[in-house]
Curated annotation (Swiss-Prot):
GO cellular component, one term: ribosome
Molecular function GO labels: rRNA binding; structural constituent of ribosome
Keywords carried by this UniProt record: Ribonucleoprotein, Ribosomal protein, RNA-binding, rRNA-binding
Record protein name field: Large ribosomal subunit protein uL24
Taxonomic path: Bacteria, Pseudomonadati, Campylobacterota, Epsilonproteobacteria, Campylobacterales
InterPro entries from the UniProt entry: KOW, Rib_uL2_dom2, Ribosomal_uL24, Ribosomal_uL24_CS, Ribosomal_uL24_KOW, Translation_prot_SH3-like_sf
SUPFAM superfamilies on file: Translation proteins SH3-like domain
Role this protein plays: One of two assembly initiator proteins, it binds directly to the 5'-end of the 23S rRNA, where it nucleates assembly of the 50S subunit.
Pfam families registered for this protein in UniProt: KOW (PF00467), ribosomal_L24 (PF17136)
Subunit structure, interactors included: Part of the 50S ribosomal subunit.
Family stated for the protein in its record: Belongs to the universal ribosomal protein uL24 family.
GO biological process terms on file: translation
Native source organism of the sequence: Campylobacter jejuni subsp. doylei (strain ATCC BAA-1458 / RM4099 / 269.97)
Amino acid sequence: MAVKLKIKKGDNVKVVTGDDKGKTGKVLAVYPKTLKVVVEGCKIAKKAIKPSEKNPNGGFINKEMPMDISNVAKVQE
């Protein structure tokens, strides 16, 4: 089922529900199949990273996680 999404990558949105309610940010990614978006600076999670050539020590990074598209509203510029 194809759904026409009103929110696109690069749009400025405001979070209307959840822990980050009231925050605004730019949309970094849109996932139409799961109806989720990734908003800059919202829904930050701490993720473990295994040691690799890029990151020899491993450790933790803070990463934006996808949130439901119904939890954000487009902001007029």
